[in-house]
């Protein structure tokens, strides 16, 4: 089940963006794959199109976006090569005053990882 993109979400709420080492290696093999992954992030995920996740995940994602309270978001997409990727954001919209920065960094609370499902 997919959602229809509406307006672009606040990119700063997605935090630091990184890739799993396996996906990074896969993208290194073909520039077009890297561009496809970036395109999914920029043109789908950042617009609230969560791809092929279940309806309960869509509901949780939309709730996290609506509340901007540090919720988690998951998107799932199939690349043109047939490989499935996940994009997972931890702490969407968490505010700095909600963070314990004595023990952790902002990146610990708020980050987005693009990966293969088996990397999770």
Task: Tell me what each language-model feature is.
Residues 64, 69-120:
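Short, compact, well-ordered microdomains
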Residues 1-73:
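Compact soluble domain cores
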